[in-house]
Structure formats: structure tokens, C-alpha cells
Regions:
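Short, aliphatic-rich beta-strand segments
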Residues: 33-35
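Short hydrophobic/aromatic beta-strand micro-patches
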Residues: 37-39
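Active-site beta-strand termini and strand-to-loop segments that position acidic
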Residues: 78-81
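Polybasic/polar functional segments that serve as interface/processing modules
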Residues: 1-31, 41-76, 90-94, 98-112
């Protein structure tokens, strides 16, 4: 696993992200290598996870391309160029079902 993925994995784990999954997009998309999906039971925790990813990534010298979502968003997207992280509230994750959309892609549990 590359360094940036390890940083993201640890950042999600530190804030108790639930059901983390890692999808391999390298065969499908020339712009991103991986997509990470995780969730949390509350909006506050959702944002804590996203903020921790942002902080840990920057601490290690990597750039954040973009973060989408405001303080009340139930879905926050963190774009790290080669990795895109979706942090959902549990209900939003169940509603949008990205796992079904990505079902044919190689994926694995991203828990520590």
C-alpha cells in the first residue's frame, strides 16, 4: 500500500470511521487510482473524519485538491488527486449506495 493510502487509512481509523472500503480505479479511470468510502453515525463525526484526513495528509506533505461539503453536509468528499474519499453519514451512505455502483471493481476492507 502506498504512503498516502496508509495516511488516509490511519486518519479514518483515528476518528472511528465505520465500514471503510477501498476501491481500485486504476483500470477504469486515468485520473484517480483509488476511492475510499467510510461512514459515521453523526454529522459531527463525519466532519471530524474528513478534517482529520485533511490534517494528516497536509502534515505529511501532500496536497488536498478539494473538499466538498459544508458544516451541515451529510456527505463530505475529500479529493487528494489520485485518491478520492467519500465520508458519509450512515443514512446517506445507505441511500446513495455507491457500493452497488462500484460492485464490479476490485475492492477490500480498509479497516486497520
Amino acid at each position: 500500500m502506498d504512503e498516502l493510502l496508509s495516511i488516509v487509512q490511519k486518519a479514518v481509523d483515528e476518528k472511528k470511521g465505520e465500514r471503510p472500503l477501498l476501491y481500485d480505479f486504476r483500470e477504469l479511470n486515468p485520473f484517480i487510482d483509488h476511492v475510499v468510502i467510510c461512514s459515521a453515525p453523526r454529522v459531527r463525526q463525519t466532519h471530524a473524519i474528513a478534517d482529520n484526513i485533511k490534517d494528516r495528509v497536509r502534515e505529511n506533505g501532500y496536497e488536498i485538491r478539494a473538499m466538498e461539503g459544508n458544516s451541515e453536509s451529510r456527505w463530505v468528499l475529500v479529493d487528494l488527486n489520485s485518491i478520492v474519499v467519500h465520508v458519509f453519514m450512515n443514512e446517506e451512505r445507505d441511500h446513495f449506495q455507491l457500493e452497488k455502483l462500484y460492485a464490479d471493481l476490485p475492492h477490500e476492507d480498509f479497516s486497520l
